[in-house]
Design a protein with these regions (language model features):
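Mg2+-dependent prenyl diphosphate-binding active-site environment of isoprenoid biosynthetic enzymes
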Residues: 25-26, 33-35, 39-40, 46-223
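Intrinsically disordered, low-complexity activation-like regions
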Residues: 15-20
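An N-terminal, well-structured beta->alpha segment
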Residues: 14, 30-32
Length: 223
């Protein structure tokens, strides 16, 4: 038993080290303008993944380092840039939306029983379902810690609402899984909740950081 556990943790540590050594997600030409900002976000992510519980760091680094385009953080940064906000809080909030997104992926893969994501073994396949669920919970709670640090109730309201809507979307998808009567309106409602809501919240949070008017904030969210 002890030998098997030691082998598991050694393997997990190797995975964590490989993830930390991996380069940041490739930047498309359209996102080159925020390449330096994205490096700052990656630094915040690495710093705020710190935990005194080794398995938390191992699973977190594994899923964060597995690739992805960081589109939600990019949207927040681009909104801030378009509205003239250059404060450092944009890096923290960009990391927050990435943590929320990553938590949904961890939970999603457990619910779906997925073995692969982006061509690699999922976290639940590598570490097991219990670890994936609990580390997803850690990422949610860390995201909310960071929101509290920002001391902006409006941003907390927007991102808390988005997190709630995403969870409802996941439950709706589960309920509709074998429903042959589901129409396009019902399907669109699910994907608006599961996917579009966090994009909307990312743009809205960027506008709030920039001190945009309510009408401009809404325009960014609608976009």
């Amino acid at each position: 038993m002890c030998e098997a556990r030691s082998s598991f943790y050694n393997r997990a540590k190797q995975i964590e080290l490989l993830s930390l050594q991996a380069s940041s997600p490739p930047t498309s030409p359209g996102l080159a303008v925020i390449a330096a900002d994205m490096q700052e976000v990656d630094a915040v992510i690495a710093r705020r993944l710190a935990s005194g519980v080794p398995l938390v760091g191992q699973v977190s680094h594994y899923i964060i380092g597995a690739g992805g385009k960081r589109l939600r953080p990019a949207l927040l940064l681009l909104t801030c840039g378009a509205l003239g906000y250059q404060g450092s809080q944009r890096f923290n909030m960009a990391a927050v939306v990435e943590f929320i997104h990553t938590a949904t992926l961890l939970h999603d893969d457990v619910v779906d029983g997925s073995a692969l994501r982006r061509g690699s073994a999922t976290a639940n396949e590598t570490f097991g379902n219990p670890a994936s669920v609990l580390v997803g919970d850690f990422l949610y709670s860390r995201a909310f810690q960071m929101m509290v640090d920002a001391k902006d109730m409006r941003i907390m309201e927007v991102l808390a609402d988005a997190t709630n809507v995403i969870a409802e979307g996941e439950v709706l998808q589960l309920m509709n899984m074998h429903d042959a009567t589901l129409d396009s309106a019902g399907y669109l409602h699910v994907i608006r909740s599961k996917t579009a809501k966090l994009f909307e919240a990312s743009a809205r949070a960027g506008a709030i950081l920039a001190g945009a008017s309510p009408s401009l904030e809404q325009a960014c969210a609608d976009y």
